[in-house]
């Protein structure tokens, strides 16, 4: 996290995209769409305890989250998989869903600043 309380780390991405603002903007627009879809899928499939579709959503966002050093997303996703496997109570699933909703919303806001 940098001094502005941002959670997205664009430094690696900037290097990969040759520090080209147009490329970064294009990537950010696509990532906004990906994180919006993931945020919705995460909550839906977690609360339904639909492990198959939950894992598909996680695998789809994982490379983007890694590129942006978003370990908190990866960690919460792994935690939520355990909640499903261990058949934890719904309130724990809801807490994870709400946490991921907040994280993804902040990520989307930060990405939109780059568009």
Predicted region positions:
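Two-component system phosphorelay core
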Residues: 1-56, 60-62, 66-115
């Amino acid at each position: 996290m940098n001094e502005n309380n941002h959670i997205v780390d664009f430094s690696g991405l900037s290097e990969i995209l040759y520090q080209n603002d147009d490329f970064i903007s294009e990537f950010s627009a696509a990532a906004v769409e990906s994180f919006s879809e993931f945020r919705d899928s995460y909550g839906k499939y977690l609360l339904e305890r639909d492990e198959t579709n939950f894992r598909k959503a996680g695998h789809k966002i994982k490379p983007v989250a890694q590129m942006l050093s978003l370990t908190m997303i990866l960690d919460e996703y792994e935690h939520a998989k355990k909640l499903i496997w261990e058949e934890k109570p719904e309130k724990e699933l809801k807490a994870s869903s709400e946490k991921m909703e907040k994280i993804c919303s902040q990520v989307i806001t930060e990405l939109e600043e780059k568009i």
